[in-house]
């Protein structure tokens, strides 16, 4: 008796076909990225993150990192990291709820709540391994089908992904458009409302209208979640963040900060009313279902907070502010469009992917690492160089950047001057006019297939000749 395979198996592709199909699809996708100038390439640092580094075997000045205060290689933080590893070992051994929550984590959470929680009467902090995980937690644990999220159009990808996972209704308002946001809030009857915004927007460097956001949240009974990834440690008195810089307090606030940028280590945190944090401990999947970060990391962050809040932190912020103002001036010397940013993120919008990559390579030839930011990170047609400043930079570094940017800018001007005007680029090559005229004369002749026919009566002899040739 012949056995027939189950119908579910009969439809399976031949062995290996699924792998081949997937690889073909991915290879086509990679080729498309190459054709559009959109493939991203990793570079390998051979030394610690600093203004002057060795990358891919070359000495460079880096304008790519988010190490805004230049603390990533600070001796006090390196020593604290080593001390934490000696005390707690190299790993946490489990999730925060199953054995991985150490004294270093608990101490850091208390310190963070005291340092950046001045906006709340009852602040509590929750430490996460990454900023991405912190934003996912805030979006998913605090919302659901009953909620509406009102999101700035330029919010970070981690917030957007969290919104998608939350199952909440998401309404996007134009970037920093408070009138549009107010209209959306007026029309909403959602049980829970969350307004969500970056504080410093990572690709433009501008700062959200935080006072207006707080006022709208309070007026409409909404919560305001702010992601201060690029403000914590840099903005406000003692680097306490964007809310402290604007002197804002509200019971409606939820504050997210990261610890791998200005703080120079790794991780992130959420600060909110203690009830909000307790709920996140119970329900935030990106907190519950992952191994806790090594305690040594938390121990190093505690050392970082001391530097940030002290006299050295003030001096580093003052130097960074001076670098920012100098950079704003030098970017205006190029042919390109600088964004009006007063933060350490200084974008220079060039436009096309090809021109942006050419500018990046020109700077790289001078030993300067300034990354090209392209779609989908930024809208099509707004590809840019993003100059990220650090207190570890010197004014000599900026002088090198200025000279290289001017040369790159002039190089693009020369390349464009060497190209014919767009109206002429579609004209046929030299000599083609003759060909066109010939084509017109040819058009007046019978088709070539008819012109080559033999004289009447020659068909038989032609056929015979072909047969002889074939033989």
Curated annotation (Swiss-Prot):
Name of the protein: 8-amino-7-oxononanoate synthase
Gene name per UniProt: bioF
Top-level division of the source organism's lineage: Bacteria
An annotated GO BP: biotin biosynthetic process
InterPro entries per UniProt: Aminotransferase_I/II_large (IPR004839), AON_synthase_class-II (IPR050087), AONS_Archaea/Proteobacteria (IPR004723), AONS_Proteobacteria (IPR022834), PyrdxlP-dep_Trfase (IPR015424), PyrdxlP-dep_Trfase_major (IPR015421), PyrdxlP-dep_Trfase_small (IPR015422)
SUPFAM superfamilies in alphabetical order: PLP-dependent transferases
Annotated source species: Burkholderia ambifaria (strain ATCC BAA-244 / DSM 16087 / CCUG 44356 / LMG 19182 / AMMD)
Stated family: Belongs to the class-II pyridoxal-phosphate-dependent aminotransferase family. BioF subfamily.
One of the Pfam families matching this protein, by short name: Aminotran_1_2
Pathway given in the UniProt record: Cofactor biosynthesis; biotin biosynthesis
Chemical reaction(s) catalysed: 6-carboxyhexanoyl-[ACP] + L-alanine + H(+) = (8S)-8-amino-7-oxononanoate + holo-[ACP] + CO2
């Amino acid at each position: 008796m012949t056995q027939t395979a189950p119908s579910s198996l009969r439809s399976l592709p031949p062995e290996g076909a699924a792998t081949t199909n997937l690889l073909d699809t991915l290879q086509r996708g990679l080729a498309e990225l190459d054709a559009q100038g959109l493939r991203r390439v990793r570079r390998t640092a051979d030394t610690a993150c600093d203004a002057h580094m060795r990358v891919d075997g070359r000495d460079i000045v880096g304008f790519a990192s988010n190490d805004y205060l230049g603390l990533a290689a600070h001796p006090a933080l390196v020593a604290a990291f080593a001390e934490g590893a000696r005390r707690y070992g190299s790993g946490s051994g489990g999730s925060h709820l199953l054995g991985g929550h150490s004294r270093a984590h608990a101490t850091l959470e208390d310190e963070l709540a005291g340092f950046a929680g001045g906006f709340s009467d009852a602040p509590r902090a929750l430490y996460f391994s990454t900023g991405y995980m912190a934003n996912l937690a805030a979006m998913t644990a605090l919302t659901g089908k009953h909620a509406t999220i009102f999101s700035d159009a330029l919010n970070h990808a981690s917030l957007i992904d969290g919104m998608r996972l939350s199952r909440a209704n998401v309404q996007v308002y134009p970037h920093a458009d408070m009138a549009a946001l107010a209209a959306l809030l007026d029309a909403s009857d959602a049980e829970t409302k969350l307004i969500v915004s970056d504080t410093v927007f990572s690709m433009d460097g501008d700062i959200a209208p935080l006072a207006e956001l707080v006022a709208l949240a309070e007026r409409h009974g909404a919560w305001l979640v702010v992601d201060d990834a690029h403000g914590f440690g840099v903005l406000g008195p003692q680097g306490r963040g964007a809310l402290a810089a604007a002197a804002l307090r509200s019971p409606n606030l939820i504050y997210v900060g990261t610890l791998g940028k200005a703080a120079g280590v790794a991780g992130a945190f959420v600060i909110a009313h203690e009830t909000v944090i307790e709920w996140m401990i119970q329900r935030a999947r990106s907190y519950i279902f992952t191994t806790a970060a090594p305690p040594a990391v938390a121990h190093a962050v505690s050392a970082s907070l001391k530097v940030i809040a002290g006299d050295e932190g003030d001096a580093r912020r003052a130097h960074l502010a001076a670098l920012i103002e100098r950079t704003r001036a030098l970017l205006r010397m190029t042919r390109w469009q600088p964004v009006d940013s007063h933060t350490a993120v200084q974008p220079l919008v060039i436009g096309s992917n090809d021109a942006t990559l050419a500018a990046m390579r020109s700077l790289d030839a001078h030993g300067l690492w300034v990354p090209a930011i392209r779609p989908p990170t930024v809208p099509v047609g707004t590809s840019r160089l993003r100059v990220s400043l650090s207190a570890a930079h010197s004014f000599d570094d900026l002088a090198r950047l200025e000279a290289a940017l001017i040369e790159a800018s002039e190089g693009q001007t020369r390349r464009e001057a060497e190209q014919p005007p767009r109206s002429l680029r579609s004209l046929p090559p030299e000599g083609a006019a003759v060909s066109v005229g010939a084509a017109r004369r040819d058009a007046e002749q019978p088709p070539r297939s008819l012109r080559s026919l033999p004289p009447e009566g020659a068909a038989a002899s032609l056929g015979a000749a072909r047969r002889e040739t074939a033989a």
